Amino acid sequence: METIATRLAILPFPEIDPVIFTIGPLAVRWYGLAYVAGILLGWLYARRIIQNASLWRNGTAPFNLAQLDDFLLWAAGGIVLGGRIGYILFYDLGSILENPVRAIQIWNGGMSFHGGLLGTTLAIIIFARRNAIPLWSLFDVVAAVVPIGLFFGRIANFINGELWGRLSSMPWAVVFPTGGPFARHPSQLYEAALEGIVLLVVLAWFVYRRRALKMPGLVTGIFVCGYAASRIFVEFFREPDAQIGYLAGDWLTMGMVLSLPMALVGIWAIARARSAAAAA
């Protein structure tokens, strides 16, 4: 039976198969393609940043293209392993303990941005120390390109019909196949716009207009604060994970709890970068 919420939804859910094509037993999915596209396009953008001498103090980047290329595999490992482990620890530990095999079934979904961030942070620290690269400069380059991956990842979430929003009567609400016969906020698209497009533009402005890379740590701090603010805002429209629900009342979610410390770290990084620049 058609509901009022269904009639109010004017944005139909696109019937896109999560699987793009198959080659024998191998299924190529939009979600996997989003990760590949995000990493490769981010890598290409990072190369442009490194090659632009005017962006850097002393007219040259503190690491070269070959080192960036070597870091690509480290970044991919940090994203995938950290994202999966983070999801298990933050969102789905109980069911994983009941069925440990699910821990490796990434194709069924279950990745955490906060876990991926921690994994990538660890990869950056180890790689920078092993290769004598200034830690904050590597952080800054990675931070400047991360929104590209966030954009593609959230679009893939939308295509998969997962991580949908709360009930909505807005004219752009969507009835998702797995969300019941109710119109919901397309919160994945909100995140793609804020965490992806808006944050990418803001960071690019600081990199190219304000020459923020000459203040190591500033771009990182802006990214962390920007993501935290965007995520906390969207959490008010996003349905919490069913296995966790709300942590308090009908508003506090795990995404908010994990993002608040990020905002504090971002503020600290910005203050540190400005203080170091003033003392130089």
Swiss-Prot record:
In the record, biological process GO terms are: lipoprotein biosynthetic process
Q: Which UniProt keywords apply?
A: Cell inner membrane, Cell membrane, Membrane, Transferase, Transmembrane, Transmembrane helix
User: In what pathway does it function?
Assistant: Protein modification; lipoprotein biosynthesis (diacylglyceryl transfer)
Question: What is the protein's major site of localization?
Answer: membrane
Which InterPro entries does the entry mention? Answer: Lgt
Membrane topology note: Multi-pass membrane protein
This enzyme's EC code(s) = 2.5.1.145
Q: Fetch the NCBIfam families from UniProt.
A: lgt
What name is this protein filed under?
Answer: Phosphatidylglycerol--prolipoprotein diacylglyceryl transferase
- Which species expresses this protein natively? Rhizobium meliloti (strain 1021) (Ensifer meliloti)
High-level lineage: Bacteria, Pseudomonadati, Pseudomonadota, Alphaproteobacteria, Hyphomicrobiales
Query: Its encoding gene is what?
Result: lgt
